[in-house]
């Protein structure tokens, strides 16, 4: 038995309480005491590791023991809860971006609509695609047949028929070819794009040969089925063949099964599926006899394409495993393979068409010149009497007259009628689909039609036009009556142009070539009348078959898109699986109904289809009773059932949200004849790694736990998925040497990414994994702080605690309930505080007030009901570190940076954690290359600022984006500024518009250029890549580097990622709040940093655009052009605003433009001069004054703009631009309903335009030589310290502090570059004058000499040594020449460095640990490896830079030159632009562009001279157009184009955000009622929610109403009942503190059952409720039980103490004898009882707990813990009896005092006898573990006997 020391902190000030526990959880002492040596050295792994452990040192000083004993006794006597302190102080309501109930309800409705729309669209598009292709196949099969059509063309006869010639039917062969080739052509285009613009692998010869063979066979089978089978079969039969395409998958399915106890049953079902699919060989159907066996061959060849999806790497057959691994390699080179195979498959389809179609259609007809052009068709009507013939002739003549009068309205009595009537016979144009019924022709009728056709052709050649009436009864001998001659194509086009609205609707042509066809078209009559029949010749609509192809291809693509969308948003069951099952049955229903209607109504569907086009229906009428009795239909039913079984994986999806298509589908292409079935078979069967709960262990679990189980059983459990909601059958995993040993979930660098040239991009495919736990998401939360306020610190800490709570719920769900959560992650938090130390009067560092402020906020941020455990503290090479264990057992490390030891600033803090977390923990500790790659891809760094506020759901959304795309290097969320004041209001609108338009545009058309450091998620594999982290650690050398590297470090890091080929995305659904600058000066200083760094990074990106476009798939040359345009608009923005103000003043006040120019120029010129000559405070003061004046002037601009609109009209360019901008903002706000309030400060934004877009850029560029931070510049060092030790300030970590007089600060809002036409700017401080530089340098040199002398004197006085040689050198240095003085200055710097090093060595770097409150923390020492890492890291990258006057002067000169160059170019460009526009405006009459829209019409009266000397007034109408200067017109069009691009990109981005939100929304109504779920399903579906309720603390986690408090009270009161903590997997207990009690109490039920775990202590819920009603008013002032050091331990107590029977009895008594049915609520909601009060839930939890933890000797652990608990029972059991009255209260206080005295005495006794007792326990339990099964009973008896004796002694 081993012992471990844990720290527990009681509420209130004072040191911590130290307890020593044995490995089995028994408390042996209550204070720190020297333990036996054999107990101090051993520390085997533990299973429970929620608290960090510290192995006791070999020697514990007596002073430490006495101090600990005194502290513990003082805590025992202290009163934790004062009964009179019942009043509560509630924290203020959080200023958060709330999503209320209405919003959640709206999401529920929206998801329901999406479900319905997806189902209907997928099902409808799949049915339409199949039916449209089948109708094309039916049209091909009609060649040479005479079919019946709708009698609307010749209504005089009840039956109309038409003969379909082969030439007319040839177009359907080409239509079928196009239909099946379009998906292949799209696949070719996609593969070609990936091959050209992405780095993809090419196939080897064997790989290409295998894929080539398979795809060729598949293409031949598909082509043969379409061209040889479908045109000759009945439509229902052809539709049924879609379910017989699974033969090869059915054969591979049983070969891919893994070993499990369900394997026999699965093999039986697989065999049935094989028999069903093989029955296609004997299926007869309606296929012609010669094609009998050909159907089975075609379906078999088609099904071979999906073999890759049905071979599994975990198969029990080695051959199947080999092919599975080979298939994974094939998928990596799929793009380059299909660049060749897609065109090849189109050639195979063409070969099949020419091979199987010519028996029906000759080659000559297939190769005709225009197969899709207009064709002639003859409509016949037989068996007509004379009256019917006369009626037909009269109708035709009337149509001719009508057509003639429409063309020649001026001719009243035509001498000869024009016979061009062919397109005027039918009413309406020919539609895409027209009616037509097929009727098999008789042989006699075919002969007669041929003879009539020959005679008719001869007659037509003899005579054109005229009406010859035939009276003979023999139609074969007499000349028929003919209608007018059909017009030529030219004439028909002319008639169409004249507006004729009557078109021909049938299709016919003779068997002749193109020349004969032209001649025939000119000679064929429109109609012919015979003795008993008539003929009507008409032209069809051109390209009608092409339109049908487009409909079919569009349906296929729509089906594919909907299916992919359903899989991405986790709606696969409804959006894909259900349509796959129902598509063919619904299609059969529709066809059966249509065929039945067609048999009775020939005009059925005539409005939607061509007259002659219809499916080939069965000859016999369709009846459902006969349908299911026929053998082919029964076989089809077997096919359908077998396909449902083969595609059962569609109903069990395991993919993550928003997964890429490469992760969802194997091949990616689709077959046009059966789109949904090809998608179903192509959908991946294993799209996510199977992760076991035993493998999901954190890194500390792996270090503490391990080893085999005690009973030697290595079998594990397959766990339920919390996402799917279905219980997976438990199956043992194969025995493996690593089974049972948790794997360290650390991360590693990607070694394969070292060069970047040989990196293989598999499109997001998951490779072979060394361990399934390596794919678990791990998040490092890294926050940088400087001088944040207490409120800002509290917001950031509360966000971390929320993340801690969420992670703990998911961890406990998979740890205790054995449910694997797909969103599970591991996280660890780090906070880096810059300049955390200040010097005291002795020159020793100690933490400043901000560190103390942060420590005070820790307990406050945790909650008001609990305090954190005692943290650990240590001294490091960079200062110090404080390590906390959060309430839900995750770790938080606070790194205190000493600027004398390490460089300060945010960028260097980021370099610290990049190298520590990714370099040290990954590269140094993980050696396997594949594991490094996998861990690096699944490890992320969440960067935070010290004032950010966010929810865990926002982090999940960013992780979803990371999982979707492996090439995604960073993702950022939507930043919301918070605070108060006008500046915050302005920033809210600015942030909103910037995110809505600018960031969304960057995301859609390229990459986001800046992922703000206040809330962003970075991928580790991207950060550790070449030229990223290493280049990020580069020290600034050039002036441009100081602007790019240090002023905008977040943007620069994203630039490095883009240049390396990674993508940066923006997630609008992930919200984070941050404090924005509230003052004018702070805002200007912040933007003074942002604008130059933004421009510098954009310029750097544009310089390297060739490399970025080449390596980055997301950046194109068009995106580079967009950024170039935006850069130009930013530079010319101030000039544009200047001109706008000048024009507005001129119009508003009706003054000359020159005077308005002078008015505006004067203040702007004064401000520019001030920025170049005066100090920062003067500049900011003048900026406020001028900005206020311009804001007041902007009110006149509003009037001027209104007048301009009234003058120029609503269609003027200025009006259009203004309304477009306002409309885009308003519509964007409507699409962001939760952010609509951000649109309200629009007026303030308008008033601030001159200040923010004209003055701010000038201020930023004029102060470009100032590189201070500018925000939160509070003095952090006391005046005494700075006065005495001013020289130490020179030893900071950067050279930048010497370039200005202000302290560095930290970025509060890390979001840059917002959407506006003009970019914002930043604020620098004033540069020193050139004349002052030399004087300052001389003074600095003299001060340094004096300082060195003082330091030498100080060392001599303190007895720390004296160096006379140094003084001699200093004296000699003053007398040297100028050259010698320079050399001496360098030597002085070296000597100063040595002195500085000695100073650091002489400092007491550990003394601060003895100060308050650090002396109460637990001191530890870093391990040697980490200490060595920090020393080497600081020495190489982070060593403080010593001051160098020459270097400082050089950099300052460079910054001044950079400032002068940029300002000169900036002012020159804007001045030239202003002059050009103003001159063009003044000379607008000479050089202008007339605006075509909105001409102005003016009416004037003029005096006109009349006859006789009299004048009169006349009206003159003058139309004028706006005259625009060319430059202004170009800029308006330019900005409109940018706005249109941004608006369009915003729409697409909103759709992506909608997809993300829908995928993350859980539909409440989709969950089955609780009473309908089994107990296992209840736990599996709601595991995380159950854990949240069990680990919740009332009053902390949610604000409950009184009814909800009553409902949750039994659960909350249960936490006060003590129960042994280690009841899990039989390993030792870590954190079970069992304090003593003075009197006997508690429940003695603990008997061990032979079949289950011992019953936990039963809690009297009715008594608890009564006590709760008495003490409820006092609970507001009580603190949480300090014995529960983490809420994770509280959850464990509640989990093992749950009892469904006690809760049932409690509810029975509380409801007047009526038992409440808590399961009848149906769904989980706010008004429903918590899940943990549901008796079925508790019963399921009990059953699962007993099953999971009843293994071997584990079942005896609870009994031992309960027996030993009687020795030291919890004193909290009596707390519920307090508060009944004052007298009883005073009596209890006396009893409590006696009890505490007894506790002290017992504690002293236990301190003395603790080691012996613990040693005895270890011996007994050691024998129990070593003994066999026969000896354990005896040993257990001895243990019980010993425990009973110990219990008596304790009593």
UniProtKB/Swiss-Prot annotation:
According to the UniProt entry, which residue ranges have a biased composition of type Low complexity? 466-478
- What PTMs does it carry? May require proteolytic cleavage for activation.
Which terms does the record give in the GO molecular function aspect? Answer: chitin synthase activity
Q: Where is the composition biased (Basic and acidic residues)?
A: 442-454, 1374-1402, 1637-1648, 1781-1822
Q: Where is this region: Disordered?
A: 1-21, 432-522, 693-718, 1350-1402, 1626-1658, 1765-1851
Compositionally skewed regions (Acidic residues) per UniProt? 513-522, 696-711, 1364-1373
Q: What happens when the gene is disrupted?
A: RNAi-mediated knockdown causes a delay in egg hatching.
Q: Where is the composition biased (Basic residues)?
A: 455-465, 1823-1834
GO annotations of cellular component type: plasma membrane
Show the InterPro entries listed in the entry: Chitin_synth (IPR004835), Nucleotide-diphossugar_trans (IPR029044)
Q: Give the coiled coil ranges.
A: 1329-1383
- What glycosylation sites does the entry record? 146, 385, 435, 469, 474, 1274, 1660
List this protein's GO terms for biological process: chitin biosynthetic process; embryo development ending in birth or egg hatching
The residues on the Extracellular side of the membrane are 130-168, 230-234, 283-291, 359-544, 595-631, 1146-1154, 1201-1209, 1257-1461, 1549-1851
Alphabetized PANTHER family for the sequence: CHITIN SYNTHASE
Q: What is this protein called?
A: Chitin synthase
């Amino acid at each position: 038995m081993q012992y471990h020391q844990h720290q527990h902190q009681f509420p209130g000030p004072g040191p911590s309480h130290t307890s020593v526990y044995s490995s089995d959880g028994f408390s042996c002492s209550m204070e720190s005491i020297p333990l036996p040596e054999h107990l101090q050295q051993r520390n085997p792994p533990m299973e429970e590791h929620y608290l960090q452990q510290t192995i006791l040192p070999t020697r514990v000083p007596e002073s430490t023991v006495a101090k600990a004993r005194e502290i513990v006794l003082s805590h025992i006597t202290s009163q934790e809860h004062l009964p009179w302190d019942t009043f509560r102080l509630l924290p203020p309501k959080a200023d958060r971006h709330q999503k209320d109930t209405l919003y959640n309800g709206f999401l529920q409705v929206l998801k329901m609509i999406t479900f319905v729309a997806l189902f209907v669209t997928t099902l409808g598009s799949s049915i339409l695609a199949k039916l449209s292709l089948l109708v094309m196949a039916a049209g091909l099969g009609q060649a040479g047949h005479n079919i019946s059509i709708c009698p609307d063309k010749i209504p005089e006869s009840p039956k109309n028929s038409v003969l379909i010639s082969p030439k007319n039917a040839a177009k359907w062969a080409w239509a079928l070819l196009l239909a099946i080739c379009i998906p292949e052509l799209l696949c070719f285009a996609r593969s070609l794009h990936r091959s050209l613009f992405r780095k993809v692998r090419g196939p080897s010869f064997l790989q290409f040969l295998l894929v080539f063979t398979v795809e060729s066979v598949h293409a031949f089978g598909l082509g043969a089925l379409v061209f040889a089978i479908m045109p000759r079969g009945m439509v229902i039969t052809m539709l049924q063949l879609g379910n017989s395409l699974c033969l090869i998958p059915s054969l591979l399915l049983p070969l891919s099964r893994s070993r499990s106890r369900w394997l026999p049953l699965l093999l039986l079902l697989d065999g049935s599926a094989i028999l069903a699919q093989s029955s296609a060989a004997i299926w007869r159907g309606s296929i012609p006899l010669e094609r009998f066996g050909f159907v089975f061959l075609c379906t078999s060849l088609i099904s071979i394409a999906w073999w890759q999806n049905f071979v599994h790497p975990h198969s029990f057959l080695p051959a199947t495993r080999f092919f599975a691994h080979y298939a994974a390699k094939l998928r990596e080179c799929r793009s380059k393979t299909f660049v060749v195979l897609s065109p090849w498959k189109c050639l195979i389809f063409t070969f099949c068409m020419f091979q199987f179609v010519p028996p029906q259609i000759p080659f000559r007809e297939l190769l005709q010149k225009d197969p899709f052009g207009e064709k002639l068709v003859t409509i016949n009507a037989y068996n007509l009497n004379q009256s019917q013939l006369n009626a037909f002739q009269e109708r035709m003549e009337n149509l001719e007259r009508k057509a003639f009068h429409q063309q020649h309205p001026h001719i009243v009595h035509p001498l000869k009628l024009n016979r061009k009537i062919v397109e005027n016979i039918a009413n309406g144009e020919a539609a895409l689909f027209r009616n037509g019924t097929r009727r098999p022709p008789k042989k006699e009728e075919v002969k007669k039609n041929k003879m009539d056709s020959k005679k008719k052709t001869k007659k037509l050649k003899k005579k054109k036009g005229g009406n010859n009436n035939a009276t003979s009864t023999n139609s074969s001998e007499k000349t028929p009556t003919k209608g007018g001659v059909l017009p030529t194509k030219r004439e028909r086009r002319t008639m169409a142009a004249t507006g004729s609205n009557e078109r021909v609707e049938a299709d016919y042509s003779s068997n002749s070539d193109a020349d004969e066809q032209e001649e025939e078209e000119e000679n064929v009559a429109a109609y012919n009348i015979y003795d008993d029949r008539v003929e009507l010749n008409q032209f069809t609509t051109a390209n009608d078959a092409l339109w049908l192809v487009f409909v079919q291809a569009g349906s296929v693509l729509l089906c594919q898109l909907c299916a992919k969308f359903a899989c991405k948003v986790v709606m696969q069951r409804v959006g894909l699986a259900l349509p796959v099952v129902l598509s063919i049955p619904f299609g059969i229903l529709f066809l059966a109904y249509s065929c039945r209607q067609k048999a009775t109504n020939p005009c059925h569907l005539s409005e939607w289809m061509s007259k002659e086009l219809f499916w080939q229906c069965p000859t016999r009428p369709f009846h459902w009773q006969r349908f299911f009795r026929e053998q082919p239909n029964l076989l089809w039913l077997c096919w359908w059932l077998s396909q449902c079984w083969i595609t059962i994986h569609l109903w069990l999806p395991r993919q993550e949200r928003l997964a890429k298509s490469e992760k969802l589908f194997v091949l990616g292409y689709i077959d046009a004849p059966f789109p949904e079935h090809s998608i179903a078979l192509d959908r991946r069967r294993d799209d996510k790694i199977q992760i076991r709960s035993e493998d999901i262990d954190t890194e500390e679990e792996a270090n503490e736990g391990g080893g085999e189980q005690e009973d030697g059983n290595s079998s594990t459990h397959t766990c339920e998925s919390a996402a799917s909601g279905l219980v997976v059958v438990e199956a043992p995993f194969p025995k493996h040497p690593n089974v049972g040993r948790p794997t360290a979930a650390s991360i590693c660098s990607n070694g394969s990414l070292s060069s970047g040239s040989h990196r293989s991009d598999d499109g997001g495919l998951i490779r072979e994994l060394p361990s399934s736990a390596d794919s678990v998401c791990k998040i490092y939360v890294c926050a940088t702080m400087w001088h944040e306020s207490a409120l800002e610190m509290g917001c950031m800490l509360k966000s971390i605690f929320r993340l801690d709570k969420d992670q703990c719920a998911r961890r406990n769900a998979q740890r205790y309930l054995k449910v694997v959560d797909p969103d599970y992650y591991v996280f660890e938090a780090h906070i880096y505080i810059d300049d955390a130390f200040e010097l005291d009067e002795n020159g020793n560092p100690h933490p400043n007030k901000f560190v103390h402020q942060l420590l005070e906020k820790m307990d406050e941020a945790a909650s008001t009901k609990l305090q954190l455990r005692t943290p650990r503290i240590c001294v490091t090479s960079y200062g110090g570190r404080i390590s906390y264990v959060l309430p839900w057992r995750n770790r938080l490390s606070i790194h205190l940076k000493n600027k004398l030891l390490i460089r300060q600033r945010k960028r260097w803090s980021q370099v610290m954690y990049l190298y520590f977390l990714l370099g040290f923990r990954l590269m140094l500790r993980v050696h396997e290359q594949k594991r490094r790659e996998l861990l690096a891809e699944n490890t992320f760094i969440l960067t935070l600022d010290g004032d950010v506020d966010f929810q865990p759901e926002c982090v999940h959304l960013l992780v979803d984006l990371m999982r979707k795309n492996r090439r995604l290097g960073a993702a950022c969320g939507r930043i919301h500024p918070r605070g108060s004041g006008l500046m915050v209001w302005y920033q809210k609108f600015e942030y909103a518009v910037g995110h809505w338009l600018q960031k969304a545009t960057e995301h859609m058309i390229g990459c986001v250029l800046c992922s703000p450091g206040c809330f962003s998620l970075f991928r580790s594999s991207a950060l550790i890549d070449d030229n990223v982290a290493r280049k990020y650690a580069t020290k600034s050398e050039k002036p441009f580097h100081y602007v790019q590297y240090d002023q905008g470090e977040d943007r620069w890091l994203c630039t490095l990622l883009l240049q390396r080929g990674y993508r940066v995305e923006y997630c609008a659904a992930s919200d984070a709040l941050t404090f924005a600058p509230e003052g004018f000066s702070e805002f200007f200083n912040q933007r003074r940093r942002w604008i130059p760094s933004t421009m510098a990074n954009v310029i750097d990106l544009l310089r390297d655009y060739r490399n970025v476009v080449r390596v980055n798939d997301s950046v194109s040359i068009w995106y580079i052009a967009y950024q170039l345009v935006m850069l130009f608009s930013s530079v010319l923005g101030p000039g544009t605003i200047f001109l706008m103000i000048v024009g507005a003043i001129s119009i508003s006040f009706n003054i000359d433009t020159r005077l308005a120019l002078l008015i505006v120029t004067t203040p702007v010129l004064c401000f520019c001069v001030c920025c170049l000559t005066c100090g920062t405070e003067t500049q900011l003061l003048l900026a406020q004054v001028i900005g206020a004046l311009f804001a007041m002037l902007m009110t006149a601009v509003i009037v001027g703009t209104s007048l301009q609109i009234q003058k120029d009209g609503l269609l003027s360019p200025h009006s259009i631009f203004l309304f477009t901008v306002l409309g885009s903002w308003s519509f964007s706000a409507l699409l962001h309903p939760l952010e609509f309030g951000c649109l309200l400060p629009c007026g303030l934004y308008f008033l601030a335009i001159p200040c923010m877009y004209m003055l701010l850029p000038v201020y930023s560029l004029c102060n470009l030589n100032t590189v201070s931070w500018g925000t939160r510049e509070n003095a952090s060092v006391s005046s005494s310290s700075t006065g005495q030790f001013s020289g130490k300030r020179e030893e900071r970590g950067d050279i930048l502090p010497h370039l200005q007089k202000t302290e560095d600060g930290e970025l509060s809002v890390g979001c840059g570059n917002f959407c506006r036409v003009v970019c914002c700017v930043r604020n620098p401080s004033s540069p020193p004058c050139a004349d002052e530089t030399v004087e300052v340098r001389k003074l600095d040199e003299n001060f340094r000499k004096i300082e060195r002398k003082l330091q030498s004197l100080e060392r001599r006085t303190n007895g720390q040594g004296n160096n006379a040689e140094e003084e001699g050198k200093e004296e000699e240095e003053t007398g040297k020449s100028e050259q010698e003085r320079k050399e001496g200055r360098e030597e002085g710097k070296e000597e100063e460095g040595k002195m500085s090093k000695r100073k650091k060595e002489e400092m007491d770097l550990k003394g601060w640990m003895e100060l308050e409150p650090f002396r109460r923390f637990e001191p530890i020492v870093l391990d040697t490896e980490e200490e060595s890492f920090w020393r080497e890291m600081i020495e190489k990258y982070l060593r403080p830079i010593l001051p160098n006057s020459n270097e400082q002067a050089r950099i300052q000169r460079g910054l001044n030159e950079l400032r002068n160059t940029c300002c000169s170019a900036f002012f020159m460009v804007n001045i030239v632009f202003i002059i050009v526009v103003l001159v063009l405006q003044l000379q607008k009459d000479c050089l202008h562009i007339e605006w075509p829209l909105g001409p102005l019409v003016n009416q004037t009266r003029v005096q006109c001279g009349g006859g006789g000397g009299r004048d009169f007034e006349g009206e003159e109408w003058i139309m004028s157009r706006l005259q625009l200067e060319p430059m202004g017109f170009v800029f308006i069009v330019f900005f409109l184009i940018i706005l249109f691009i941004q608006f369009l990109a915003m729409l697409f981005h909103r759709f992506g955000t909608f997809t993300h939100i829908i995928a993350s929304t859980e539909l409440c109504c989709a969950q089955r009622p609780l009473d309908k779920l089994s107990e296992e399903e209840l736990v599996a579906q709601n595991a995380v929610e159950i854990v949240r309720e069990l680990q919740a603390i009332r009053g902390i986690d949610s604000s409950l109403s009184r009814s909800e408090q009553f409902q949750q009270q039994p659960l909350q009161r249960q936490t006060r009942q003590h129960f042994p903590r280690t009841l899990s997997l039989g390993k030792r207990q870590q954190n079970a503190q069992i304090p003593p009690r003075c009197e006997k109490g508690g429940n003695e039920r603990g008997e061990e059952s032979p079949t289950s775990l011992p019953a936990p202590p039963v809690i009297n819920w009715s008594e608890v409720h009564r006590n709760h009603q008495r003490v409820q008013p006092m609970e507001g002032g009580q603190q949480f039980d300090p014995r529960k050091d983490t809420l994770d331990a509280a959850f464990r107590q509640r989990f093992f103490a749950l009892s469904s029977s006690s809760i049932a009895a409690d509810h029975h008594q509380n409801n007047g004898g009526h038992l409440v049915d808590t399961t009848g609520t149906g769904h989980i909601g706010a008004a429903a009882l918590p899940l943990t009060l549901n008796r079925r839930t508790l019963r399921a939890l009990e059953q699962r707990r007993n099953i999971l933890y009843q293994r071997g000797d584990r079942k005896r652990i609870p009994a031992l813990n309960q027996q030993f608990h009687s020795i030291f029972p919890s004193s909290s059991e009596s707390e519920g009896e307090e508060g009944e009255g004052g007298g009883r209260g005073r009596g209890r206080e006396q009893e409590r005092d006696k009890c505490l005295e007894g506790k002290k005495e017992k504690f002293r006794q236990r301190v003395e006898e603790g080691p012996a007792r613990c040693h005895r326990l270890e011996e007994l339990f050691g024998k129990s573990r070593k003994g066999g099964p026969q000896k354990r009973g005896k040993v257990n008896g001895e243990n019980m006997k010993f425990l009973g004796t110990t219990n008596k002694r304790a009593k």
